[in-house]
């Protein structure tokens, strides 16, 4: 497989990016095929982490070109109020180098707090050149943590293999433990995200997910029509997990080992879609397909596309 290498939209302002993306959506919205709601949905986890660096511009482009229907990504907030695409609200030394291309130790990582840095400062860190033993097929390349504006501006120009329009699964990285040092409060975070997806013109193609009940509650209170996904990473019955919310989410998204066919049937019987994370081998992907899940979040959208 030949991997596409892109540096992304470095240098463009976020306001210009938002305007460009919104105009692109409006000019193209009548040219896409309708999505089949019964077809297995392929979500590229952090782009295509098994092939290129996570949450990166090259990763999101590759995910779409390898068959993803949905780009799954993580959101943090910078000091200047920008939505930064990053799994941690700090510079993880396992994937990032500092602006001098020096390694970042575990003790140093949280001193590089994204919530205390501007988007411009964050972009000075290389978060793609470090090799990851867990992903031997990943092509390492210099890249940075982009803003949501930049990702959408680029993704809207990439044709999907089935001719449909790209969709987005956006995770709010909020918790009581992170707040307020590493993230804003749940309501502020939710409003920033909802305002941004509205400005970008993609609200009808967005799902907002979180492990934080407070974050999802805030999203639902501000915009009851926004699609929501409840991320589950702990053991417990399906109902006990759902009871942690005061409303019914559109999607139940458990760690893939925490779900079985009976759970899938129960949830779908309640009109809740089931989209587990993060399965990567053919055997695990096949097992989930056999359960009848609605979609799968995977680091290898290329493998899942061939199995669909």
Regions found by a protein language model. Give the residues of each.
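Sec-dependent N-terminal signal peptides
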Residues: 1-2
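Phosphate-group recognition and catalysis centered on beta-loop-alpha active-site segments
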Residues: 9-308
């Amino acid at each position: 497989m030949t991997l596409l290498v892109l540096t992304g939209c470095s240098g463009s302002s976020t306001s210009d990016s938002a305007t460009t993306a919104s105009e692109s959506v409006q000019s193209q919205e009548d040219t896409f095929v309708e999505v089949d709601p019964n077809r297995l949905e392929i979500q590229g986890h952090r782009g295509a982490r098994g092939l290129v660096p996570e949450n990166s511009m090259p990763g999101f482009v590759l995910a779409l070109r390898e068959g993803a229907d949905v780009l799954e990504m993580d959101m943090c907030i910078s000091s200047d109020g920008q939505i930064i695409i990053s799994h941690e609200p700090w510079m993880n030394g396992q994937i990032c180098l500092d602006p001098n291309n020096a390694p970042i130790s575990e003790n140093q990582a949280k001193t590089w707090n994204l919530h205390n840095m501007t988007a411009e400062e964050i972009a000075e860190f290389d978060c793609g050149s470090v090799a990851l033993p867990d992903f031997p097929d990943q092509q390492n390349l210099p890249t940075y943590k982009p803003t949501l504006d930049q990702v959408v501006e680029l993704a809207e120009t990439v044709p999907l293999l089935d001719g449909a329009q790209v969709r987005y699964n956006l995770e709010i990285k909020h918790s009581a433990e992170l707040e307020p040092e590493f993230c804003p409060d749940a309501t502020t975070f939710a409003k920033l995200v909802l305002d941004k997806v509205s400005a970008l013109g993609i609200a009808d193609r967005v799902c907002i997910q979180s492990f934080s009940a407070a974050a999802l509650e805030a999203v639902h209170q501000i915009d009851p029509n926004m699609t929501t996904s409840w991320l589950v990473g702990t053991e417990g019955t399906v109902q006990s997990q759902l009871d942690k919310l005061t409303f019914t989410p559109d999607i139940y998204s458990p760690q893939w080992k925490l779900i079985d066919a009976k759970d899938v049937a129960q949830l779908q019987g309640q009109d809740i879609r089931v989209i587990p994370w993060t399965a990567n081998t053919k055997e695990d992907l096949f097992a989930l397909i056999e359960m009848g899940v609605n979609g799968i979040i995977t680091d290898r959208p290329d493998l899942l596309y061939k199995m669909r």
